[in-house]
């Protein structure tokens, strides 16, 4: 015969385990501290320094959150702290006549890296490219870059792009809390995937949530440099991860300089998120001052 006390203990343990694994307890799930890297610039695009924790208004899903950690980083001025950048070359949609332009843009970016910076180049169709390396290896991959094999070659599917972003983010997640930047040079279909609807056209919604989730944990933001004239509207992976899209410029060099500037000047804010079972959370960061512009990720996964 089973004794009363052991039986009650076993029953309580089983009941608690069932509760913790049930869908109804999703709102009580354990959450990690959320880190948000924030770039603040003035009207001239120059970094705004000297801000304090109380200068920031941060909200998740519309609710104010209390900042628990606050770090101001200016690694561009500290030669002992590396910046982190991965350049993604679109070799799927860019025709051969654009190869020289893509190479020139990528080369300019690579040459701005300091010896201490972490820089790598990956090509969309090359599965062997890893987001690690040095400037010499990066320049070699740029020289090896080739455009699409056919002028009207099928473009990479949105889910393929999102899976690549997730893979790069995952590999860089272990490199610390510092900001990482993924710069895609190419066409919108690869470099600026639009956000899917949850139901309408949302066959890659799961890939979207995975990509923004891992990118948020890795502090990775995506920037896009559209190397050919393109008509495009926002609300995509670039905006969701806190990056910028550059296009239709007669001189891209100041824009490329801006990317390195953002990699080296930013604020890192940390907060405990409100309990929620939503798949995707919206993030809003504001600095209630005149003549300042705030750039930060807009979404994170659960």
Language-model-detected regions and their locations in the chain:
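Scaffold/interface architecture of coatomer-like assemblies
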Residues: 24-302
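Bacterial N-terminal signal peptides that target proteins for export
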Residues: 1-13
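Bacterial N-terminal signal peptides
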Residues: 10-22
């Amino acid at each position: 015969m089973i004794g009363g006390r052991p039986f009650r203990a076993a029953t309580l343990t089983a009941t608690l385990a069932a509760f913790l694994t049930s869908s109804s307890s999703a709102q009580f799930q354990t959450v990690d501290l959320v880190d948000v890297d924030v770039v603040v610039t003035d009207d001239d695009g120059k970094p705004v320094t000297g801000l304090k924790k109380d200068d920031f208004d941060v909200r998740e899903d519309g609710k104010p959150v209390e900042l628990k950690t606050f770090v101001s980083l200016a690694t561009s001025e500290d030669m002992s702290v590396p910046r982190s950048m991965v350049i993604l070359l679109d070799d799927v949609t860019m025709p051969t006549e654009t190869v020289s332009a893509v190479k020139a843009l990528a080369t300019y970016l690579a040459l701005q890296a300091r010896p201490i910076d972490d820089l790598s180049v990956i090509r969309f169709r090359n599965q062997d490219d890893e987001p690690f390396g040095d400037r010499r290896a990066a320049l070699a991959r740029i020289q090896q870059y080739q455009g699409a094999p056919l002028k009207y070659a099928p473009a990479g599917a949105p889910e393929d792009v999102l899976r690549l972003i997730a893979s790069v983010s995952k590999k860089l997640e272990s490199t610390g809390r510092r900001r990482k930047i993924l710069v895609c040079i190419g066409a919108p279909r690869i470099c600026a995937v639009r956000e899917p609807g949850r139901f309408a056209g949302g066959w890659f919604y799961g890939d979207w949530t995975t990509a923004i989730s891992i990118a948020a944990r890795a502090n990775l933001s995506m920037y896009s440099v559209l190397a050919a004239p393109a008509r495009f509207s926002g609300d995509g992976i670039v905006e969701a991860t806190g990056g910028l899209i550059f296009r239709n410029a007669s001189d891209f060099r100041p824009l490329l300089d801006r990317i390195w500037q953002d990699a080296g000047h930013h604020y890192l804010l940390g907060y405990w998120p409100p309990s929620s079972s939503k798949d995707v959370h919206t993030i809003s960061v504001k600095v209630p001052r005149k003549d300042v512009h705030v750039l930060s990720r807009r979404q994170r996964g659960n």
